[in-house]
């Protein structure tokens, strides 16, 4: 279920009709995950994963469990960091852009610099995925849905727990947790470390977490919860190689002197802190009040831009994979308050919410080495123009969001209910930089959803909905000519927020302990924000960010999960996705085969498939429990071919991967032991984990597979571990 506000026209219609009494009608909070509630009355496609499911898979990153949900695609980064996409939206973007999905952790709408998700995998209580435009609940960037992660809490962690794991390529994990509970309170604290040397050269990482939660029961109807998560993360290269030939001969991305094959960014040092405080109060009138305050800090340092030229502007072949141009220091603070009042009655339910955010983003980029100023048309070089420690950029953006939202749900006739949501966001951007530039912008955006659910039987329902999502322009898009380091892009302060429109109809049922959910969907994106020269396209003239893009994402999703019998569990997730550009008039590539000139050829990409969207995805997981305490799991993950580029020139073949997990639990007295072993890519299949291209990388005048940036999968991987609970 979900939450939002009252669509006045729907309210007037609903209140004028006689509603049948089907028991209390309820709405679901966006601040907490009501994972125990039935999905039968939902008007949108929703999937949930429990802590037991996440823990039973013994995953190294969130991708390994999210692929069991239809419509989810992820891009795995180094370590346990991933970027999540839903229904192919924003799969064409691969830098640090927002993902088009709202990520909410314990009520905190989290955004990290890279658009990725960093969360302690051992502190997850549940994951809820809402598909379709979800800005009616979560505001900015919920173009295709939301992923809601709730961390562990409650009296069930009133024990001690420790685990150790080892695996391929130096993987090690250590964790210790202790908790306590009585009638008045419960708490736990947990410390963990995940580290590995990595398959690829320089792909080592080390993630340390300290987190905990304290819940105090004020009385029988109210409680207060404080949660904290602190992490230090060090990670290096993603293992990128340049071109198909190097992918075949050098999959480990060992630096062999090809300066163009280096990762654009390296040596990340990330410090994260999440704090939240939630007050919850139940009232006798079937109402609940939630107030959630939070602070989220992200301080990220890294190096960027592989160096190819010395201070005179001359190409230097002696430069290595340690030579980079810029030092980057990015710091953000997200602060906010969310409050919701939910009320449930025999025939209708309401929710009213307030979402206030005060976010600050600071970015500082300095030169690591002296560099020349190089201009084209006519070509000229000024040696030592930029000196070590000079600013490349230094800026601060304050983002303030003032939003109200709500939901109204009404029984219309026997077994038929309708839901209406609406949200209003006022967004204020205020930008300042070291050049004394100051820009401000304001956006007012409405988002909404209307849906219906018909309960055929107690275990079967048909649902349909229409919803919207939006994304507001960023300062770097609005004022690119002034704040961007690239002089070819000019300002466009008239940019408007982009909108996605989601249409969905579905059928869900539970038969003999097996859950079925079938959904047909379409997402239309008109006039979305893109550069006039295309996504990462070259340009030989001025360009700008503009509302000029169009795309359509439509398909079918099927989810089947449950118990075939008490010893055999099944999960099937199938997605058919047809995602293509409906408007993409100009994509530029420099194909003149001369590194000192910039002659661009422009192409029309309208009608082409969205890069990195497979038409077919199928994930199947079978759990078999032949003996008490023993569980054997087999997993198959299939993806059909996709294109790595906007022009649909470079086709990446289909692949099928098999994984296996075995675990055994043994209990004696107050002690519970568990041992497990996991093998990923069981048959050691070679394939590209990521593949992308937007230009003639090797400058040979031909756009082909040698222009790809590729991360080759690490192949067969083993992991094993032992845990004890007491």
Predicted regions and their residues:
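Gram-negative outer-membrane beta-barrel transporters
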Residues: 411-418, 522-524, 544-645, 723-725
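Conserved C-terminal beta-signal and adjacent last beta-strands/turns
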Residues: 7, 216-218, 229, 408, ...
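Membrane-embedded beta-barrel scaffold of Gram-negative outer-membrane proteins
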Residues: 184-185, 288-304, 455, 461-467, ...
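N-terminal periplasmic accessory domains that precede
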Residues: 62, 84-85, 101-104, 117, ...
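Outer-membrane beta-barrel signature, preferentially recognizing the C-terminal barrel domain
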Residues: 251-282, 393-399, 470-525, 535-563, ...
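Transmembrane beta-barrel wall of Gram-negative outer-membrane proteins
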Residues: 159, 166-195, 200-238, 265-288, ...
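Surface-exposed extracellular loop regions of Gram-negative outer-membrane beta-barrel proteins
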Residues: 240, 245, 360-362, 367, ...
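Short acidic/polar hinge/loop motifs at secondary-structure boundaries
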Residues: 101, 106-132, 246, 251
């Amino acid at each position: 279920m979900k939450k939002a506000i009252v669509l006045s026209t729907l309210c007037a219609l609903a209140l004028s009709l006689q509603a049948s009494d089907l028991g209390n009608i309820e709405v679901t909070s966006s601040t907490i995950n009501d994972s125990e509630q039935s999905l039968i009355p939902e008007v949108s496609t929703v999937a949930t994963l429990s802590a037991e499911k996440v823990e039973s898979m013994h995953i190294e990153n969130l991708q390994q469990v999210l692929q069991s949900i239809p419509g989810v695609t992820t891009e795995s980064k180094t370590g346990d960091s991933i970027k999540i996409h839903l229904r192919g939206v924003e799969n064409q973007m691969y830098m640090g852009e927002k993902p088009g999905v709202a990520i909410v952790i314990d009520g905190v709408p989290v955004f990290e610099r890279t658009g990725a998700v960093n969360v302690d995998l051992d502190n997850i209580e549940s994951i809820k995925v809402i598909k379709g435009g979800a800005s009616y609940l979560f505001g900015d960037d919920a173009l295709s849905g939301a992923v809601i992660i709730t961390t562990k809490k409650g009296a069930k962690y009133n024990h001690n727990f420790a685990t150790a794991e080892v695996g391929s390529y130096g993987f090690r994990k250590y964790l210790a947790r202790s908790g306590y509970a009585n009638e008045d309170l419960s708490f736990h604290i947990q410390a963990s470390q995940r580290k590995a040397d990595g398959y690829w050269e320089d792909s080592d990482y080390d993630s340390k977490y300290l987190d905990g939660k304290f819940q105090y029961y004020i009385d029988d109807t109210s409680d207060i919860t404080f949660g904290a998560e602190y992490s230090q993360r060090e990670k290096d290269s993603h293992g990128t190689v340049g071109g198909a030939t190097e992918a075949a001969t050098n999959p480990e991305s060992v630096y062999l002197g090809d300066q163009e094959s280096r990762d654009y960014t390296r040596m990340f040092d990330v410090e994260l802190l999440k704090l939240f405080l939630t007050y919850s109060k139940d009232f006798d009138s079937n109402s609940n009040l939630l107030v959630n305050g939070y602070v989220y800090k992200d301080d990220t340092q890294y190096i960027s831009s592989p160096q190819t030229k010395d201070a005179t502007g001359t190409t230097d072949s002696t430069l290595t994979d340690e030579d980079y141009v810029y030092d980057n220091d990015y710091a953000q603070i997200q602060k906010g308050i969310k409050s919701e009042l939910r009320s449930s009655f025999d025939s209708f339910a309401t929710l009213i919410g307030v979402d206030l955010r005060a976010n600050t983003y600071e970015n500082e980029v300095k030169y690591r080495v002296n560099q020349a100023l190089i201009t084209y048309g006519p070509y000229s070089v000024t040696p030592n123009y930029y000196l070590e420690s000079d600013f490349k950029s230094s800026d601060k953006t304050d983002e303030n969001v003032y939003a109200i939202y709500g939901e109204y749900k009404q029984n219309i006739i026997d077994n038929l209910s309708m839901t209406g949501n609406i949200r209003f966001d006022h967004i204020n951007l205020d930008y300042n930089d070291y050049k004394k530039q100051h820009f401000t912008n304001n956006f007012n955006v409405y988002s909404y959803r209307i849906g219906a659910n018909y309960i055929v039987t107690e275990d079967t329902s048909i649902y349909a909905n229409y919803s919207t999502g939006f994304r507001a322009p960023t300062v770097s898009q609005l004022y690119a000519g002034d704040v961007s380091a690239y002089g070819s892009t000019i300002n466009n302060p008239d940019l408007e927020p982009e909108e996605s429109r989601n249409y969905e109809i579905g059928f869900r049922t539970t038969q003999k302990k097996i859950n079925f959910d079938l959904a047909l969907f379409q997402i239309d994106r008109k006039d979305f924000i893109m550069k006039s020269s295309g996504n990462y396209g070259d340009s030989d003239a001025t360009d700008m960010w503009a509302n000029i893009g169009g795309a359509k994402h439509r398909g079918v999703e099927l989810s089947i999960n449950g118990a075939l019998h008490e010893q055999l569990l099944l999960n099937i997730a199938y997605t058919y996705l047809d995602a293509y550009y409906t408007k993409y008039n100009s994509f530029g590539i420099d194909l003149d085969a001369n590194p000192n000139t910039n002659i661009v050829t422009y192409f029309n990409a309208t009608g082409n498939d969205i890069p990195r969207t497979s038409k077919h995805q199928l994930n199947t997981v079978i759990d078999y429990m032949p003996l008490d305490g023993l569980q054997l799991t087999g997993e198959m993950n299939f993806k059909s071919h996709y294109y790595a580029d906007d022009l649909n020139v470079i086709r990446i073949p289909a692949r099928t991967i098999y994984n296996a997990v075995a675990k055994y639990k043994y209990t004696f007295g107050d002690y519970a032991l568990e041992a497990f072993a996991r093998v990923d890519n069981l048959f050691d299949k070679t394939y590209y984990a990521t593949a992308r291209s937007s230009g003639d990388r090797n400058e040979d005048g031909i756009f082909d597979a040698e222009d790809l940036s590729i991360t080759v999968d690490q192949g067969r991987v083993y992991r094993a571990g032992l845990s004890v609970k007491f």
